[in-house]
């Protein structure tokens, strides 16, 4: 089998396509959450904490010298990233929880008993005939 045919077989499997769609949607969702945190959540928190802009919070390790930028630890951006992660993790948790509850409901649905096999039907007929002979 040629390399191209193998790749087509691999790429056309449902799991690979589902994974690709999930990655694209996940990336878009991450951007939405980042904007939500940076533009909606953090400004009111900054006002409550005395007009702090979290994205500007940093510790300067070395001041800028000439063309070289300052060396800083940008812990404000880190705080925003942690909040982003927390919201995304919670959303994923809630989605998985919903999916798992749907799976449980499907599993809990009572299954119809399997139809008896021909051997079982034949044995039942023999049993019924033997009972009928004993009653005579």
UniProtKB/Swiss-Prot annotation:
| Pfam families hit by this protein | MscL (PF01741)
* Record's bilayer topology term: Multi-pass membrane protein
GO cellular component annotations, sorted alphabetically?
plasma membrane
Cite the GO molecular-function annotations of the record. Answer: mechanosensitive monoatomic ion channel activity
Q: Which Gene3D superfamilies match?
A: Large-conductance mechanosensitive channel, MscL, domain 1
Question: Per the record's keyword annotation, is Disulfide bond included, yes or no?
Answer: no
- Residues annotated as transmembrane: 9-29, 79-99
User: Which InterPro entries does this UniProt record tie to the protein?
Assistant: Mechanosensitive_channel_CS (IPR019823), MS_channel (IPR001185), MSC/AndL (IPR037673), MscL_channel (IPR036019)
Keywords carried by this UniProt record: Cell inner membrane, Cell membrane, Ion channel, Ion transport, Membrane, Transmembrane, Transmembrane helix, Transport
Q: From the Swiss-Prot or TrEMBL record, state where the protein is found.
A: Cell inner membrane
The family line of this record is: Belongs to the MscL family.
Summarizing the function annotation, the protein's role is: Channel that opens in response to stretch forces in the membrane lipid bilayer. May participate in the regulation of osmotic pressure changes within the cell.
Q: How does it assemble?
A: Homopentamer.
* Descriptive protein name: Large-conductance mechanosensitive channel
Q: Which organism is it from?
A: Shewanella sp. (strain MR-4)
């Amino acid at each position: 089998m040629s390399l191209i045919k193998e790749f087509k077989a691999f790429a056309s499997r449902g799991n690979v396509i589902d994974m690709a769609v999930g990655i694209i949607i996940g990336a878009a969702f991450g951007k939405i959450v980042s904007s939500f945190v940076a533009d909606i959540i953090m400004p009111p928190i900054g006002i409550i904490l005395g007009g702090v802009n979290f994205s500007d919070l940093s510790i300067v390790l070395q001041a800028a010298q000439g063309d070289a930028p300052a060396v800083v630890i940008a812990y404000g951006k880190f705080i925003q990233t942690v909040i982003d992660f927390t919201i995304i993790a919670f959303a994923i948790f809630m989605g998985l929880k919903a999916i798992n509850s749907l799976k449980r409901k499907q599993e809990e649905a009572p299954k119809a008993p399997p139809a008896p096999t021909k051997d079982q039907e034949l044995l039942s007929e023999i049993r019924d005939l033997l009972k009928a002979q004993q009653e005579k």
